[in-house]
């Protein structure tokens, strides 16, 4: 079972959609070798070195955490039902109210839209806040996403810079 990597007052909590089969098998977030999450957050500067999925607990030392909208593993996120995503959105709101990070970064526009019931979603900072927590929508780093590593880094860099500016 995949567990949240959360603590009070983190800089950012990255919210994946749900675990893929490789992640579920290995027991670590973003464990599929084709997933670029660990590379992206390192290139942007959230981590000083490239962490492996097995080192996910070290994210807490950097002020970062991980959660997910839905705990059920699937081959593709498109297998998730609308109700699962809505319930996941409600659970994320509760977690953010409890842990109060500076930012929540939901990794996927369509999943964010369905989980939070917002029809028009753009990339980046959202007008929605959860308490004092800023809400961001960033591209999913899954290998199934056609975005290049460079474009993922640019998107995540915007969040990193915003957090640095207000530090």
From Swiss-Prot:
GO biological process terms on file: base-excision repair, AP site formation
GO molecular function: DNA binding; pyrimidine-specific mismatch base pair DNA N-glycosylase activity; uracil DNA N-glycosylase activity
Oligomeric and partner information: Binds DNA as a monomer.
The UniProt record lists the keyword Lipoprotein: no
InterPro entries linked to this entry: MUG/TDG (IPR015637), MUG_bact (IPR023502), Uracil-DNA_glycosylase-like (IPR005122), Uracil-DNA_glycosylase-like_sf (IPR036895)
Protein name: G/U mismatch-specific DNA glycosylase
Function, in words: Excises ethenocytosine and uracil, which can arise by alkylation or deamination of cytosine, respectively, from the corresponding mispairs with guanine in ds-DNA. It is capable of hydrolyzing the carbon-nitrogen bond between the sugar-phosphate backbone of the DNA and the mispaired base. The complementary strand guanine functions in substrate recognition. Required for DNA damage lesion repair in stationary-phase cells.
Keywords in alphabetical order: Cytoplasm, DNA damage, DNA excision, DNA repair, DNA-binding, Hydrolase
């Amino acid at each position: 079972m995949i567990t949240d990597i959360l603590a009070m007052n983190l800089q950012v909590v990255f919210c994946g959609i749900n675990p893929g089969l490789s992640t579920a098998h290995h027991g670590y977030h973003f464990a599929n070798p084709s997933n670029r999450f660990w590379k992206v957050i390192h290139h942007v500067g959230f981590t000083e070195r490239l962490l492996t999925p097995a080192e996910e607990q070290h994210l807490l030392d950097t002020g970062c955490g991980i959660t997910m909208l839905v705990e059920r593993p699937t081959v593709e996120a498109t297998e998730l039902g609308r109700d699962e995503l809505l319930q996941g959105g409600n659970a994320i709101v509760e977690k953010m109210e409890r842990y109060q990070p500076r930012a929540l970064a939901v990794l996927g526009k369509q999943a964010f839209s369905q989980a939070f019931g917002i029809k028009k979603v753009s990339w980046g900072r959202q007008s929605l806040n959860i308490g004092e927590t800023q809400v961001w929508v960033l591209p999913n780093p899954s290998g199934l996403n056609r975005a290049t590593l460079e474009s993922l880094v640019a998107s995540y860099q915007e969040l990193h810079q915003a957090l640095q500016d207000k530090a």
